[in-house]
């Protein structure tokens, strides 16, 4: 799976979910500036990790020092700094009252977020007839009626045969969205050509979250007609009053044959018996990069090591961001993605040679070089 931007809101309890209150309405696609900022953030994190590893190495080589530090830290857990206890009783009572008032604020904030989700669900139902009509045209179930056409739009004439619907509509959409397009392999394209619709619905009742549905025509790879991916929010809000992601679940893909499974590949190795000198071929299955890994989201284990936890956290951040991209960008703005309109068009048209990364710093200009440069500028 391709790595993506890691610039996400975090808390100890999860990742902040985008809602109608914090989702940028004009951010159709990930901009180059955002990606560069994420790259710089990742570089900073790598530098911090390097320093952390160095300190960890020193502590591992000095068990006495490590034991002393752990003892000091364990004695501080849950221990007050003593400041509150030093205040006058009347002041402590006022602080207690403020804590109670804050609980009232939290309850109102939770009610507000719930109402926002209810409002989003209400308007989601208004979108559904439009999205259903869009799907009919894309699939070729029916043709546009006169009222749906803009007769001022230029129609280019040619002698090409008239296909059914809009071929490879969703594959083109996904390719044109940077974060998702990076996940698609040439082998994935063979399946994604049969992708006929993508939908989302908010979860109902006491369960908070949303579900993505990917509808496929018959293909030579799996038997599923619909693949779903469901994102769940936590019941509690973040300190800033936002819903937090809890976990995601994806459908099991029913591959027609093991060799059709795009998420794994078979590696063959030759082994030689030391005693008999005979050789044999050993086949092992290893993970493979594929868009369809999206339906097998990473899961955090309680006994995960620190390094493993960091890697899983990055994958979780990317997975949640992908869900938001589908829900807030690809599905509601599918035609913009297909036509490469909006921010994405500007991003894709930038030549690599124009980017900052394409240039390297050279030595300071000599006086002769400066004269030549000044001459070229003046000309």
Swiss-Prot record:
InterPro entries: NAP-like_sf (IPR037231), NAP_family (IPR002164). The keyword Nucleus applies. It is found in: Nucleus. Pfam families: NAP. The keyword Nucleus applies. Its main location: nucleus. Keywords: Nucleus. Residues 1-30, 345-379 are annotated as: Disordered. GO terms for cellular component: chromatin; cytoplasm; cytosol; nucleus. Residues 16-28 have a biased composition (Polar residues). One of its GO terms (molecular function) is H2A-H2B histone complex chaperone activity. GO terms for biological process: nucleosome assembly. Residues 1-10 have a biased composition (Basic and acidic residues). Belongs to the nucleosome assembly protein (NAP) family. This is Putative nucleosome assembly protein C2D10.11C. It comes from Schizosaccharomyces pombe (strain 972 / ATCC 24843) (Fission yeast).
């Amino acid at each position: 799976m391709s790595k993506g931007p890691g610039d996400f809101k975090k808390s100890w309890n999860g990742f902040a979910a985008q809602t109608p209150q914090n989702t940028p309405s004009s951010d159709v696609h990930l901009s180059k500036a955002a990606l560069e900022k994420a790259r710089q953030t990742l570089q900073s994190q790598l530098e911090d990790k390097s320093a952390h590893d160095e300190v960890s190495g020193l502590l591992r080589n000095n068990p006495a020092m490590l034991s002393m530090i752990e003892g000091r830290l364990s004695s501080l857990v849950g221990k007050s700094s003593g400041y509150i206890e030093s205040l006058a009783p009347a002041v402590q009572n006022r602080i207690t009252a403020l804590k109670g008032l804050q609980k009232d604020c939290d309850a109102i904030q939770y009610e507000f977020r719930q109402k926002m989700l209810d409002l989003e669900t209400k308007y989601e139902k208004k979108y559904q007839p439009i999205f259903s009509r869009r799907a009919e045209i894309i699939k070729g179930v029916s043709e546009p009626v006169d009222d749906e056409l803009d007769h001022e739009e230029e129609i280019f004439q040619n002698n090409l045969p008239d296909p059914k619907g809009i071929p490879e509509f969703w594959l083109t959409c996904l390719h044109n969205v940077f974060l998702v397009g990076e996940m698609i392999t040439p082998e994935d394209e063979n399946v994604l050509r049969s992708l006929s619709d993508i939908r989302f619905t908010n979860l109902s009742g006491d369960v908070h979250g949303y579900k993505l549905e990917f509808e496929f025509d018959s293909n030579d790879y799996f038997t599923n007609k619909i693949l779903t991916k469901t994102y769940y929010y936590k019941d509690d809000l973040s300190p800033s009053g936002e819903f937090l992601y809890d976990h995601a679940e994806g459908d099991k893909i029913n591959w027609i044959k093991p060799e059709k499974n795009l998420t794994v590949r078979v590696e063959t190795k030759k082994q030689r018996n030391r005693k008999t000198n005979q050789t044999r071929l050993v086949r092992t299955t290893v993970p493979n990069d594929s868009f369809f890994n999206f339906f097998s989201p990473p899961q955090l284990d309680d006994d995960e090591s620190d390094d493993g936890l960091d890697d899983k956290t990055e994958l979780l951040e990317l997975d949640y961001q992908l869900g938001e991209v589908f829900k807030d960008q690809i599905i509601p703005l599918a035609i913009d993605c297909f036509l490469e309109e909006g921010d994405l068009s500007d991003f894709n048209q930038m030549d690599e040679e124009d980017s900052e990364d394409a240039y390297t710093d050279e030595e300071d200009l000599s006086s002769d070089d400066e004269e030549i440069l000044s001459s070229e500028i003046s000309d």
